[in-house]
């Protein structure tokens, strides 16, 4: 497994991020990414405006971390969209991998955004499509 320092040196300009908001969800998401079932993700747009997170940049390679902070995957951003929560569709939900359908996505993301104090039916979301560039191992 590559250290985070080595991964960031290899992919200059990369941003390191933790998929998910718990250890269990992080492990599930990394497994879905590795399997190829997860090629998209989203979050509230405001976290990129307020500096909580770094907005993905098309073409940039970023480093997905496991819950312990170790480099797990290098991902390349293919597309970034701004879309309202209530305009999310089945196509984008399917790319996220962890949801059965749009209704399941809405339940999951409403709970997640509510926990973070960011939910509104029309909240702007960032939707990213990505590909795996390198798997640093489990």
Spans of features found by a protein language model:
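Mixed-charge, low-complexity intrinsically disordered regions
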Residues: 1-74, 80-138
């Amino acid at each position: 497994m590559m250290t985070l320092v080595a991964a960031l040196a290899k992919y200059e300009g990369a941003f390191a991020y933790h998929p998910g908001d718990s250890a269990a969800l992080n492990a599930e998401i990394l497994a879905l990414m590795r399997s190829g079932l997860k090629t998209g993700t989203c979050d509230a747009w405001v976290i990129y405006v307020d500096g909580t997170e770094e907005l993905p940049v098309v073409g940039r390679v970023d480093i997905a971390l496991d819950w312990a902070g170790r480099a797990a995957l290098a991902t390349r951003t293919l597309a970034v969209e701004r879309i309202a929560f209530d305009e999310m569709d089945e196509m984008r939900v399917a790319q996220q991998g962890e949801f059965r359908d749009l209704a399941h996505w809405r339940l999951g993301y409403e709970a997640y955004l509510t926990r973070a104090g960011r939910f509104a039916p029309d909240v702007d979301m960032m939707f990213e499509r990505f590909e795996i560039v390198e798997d640093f191992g489990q």
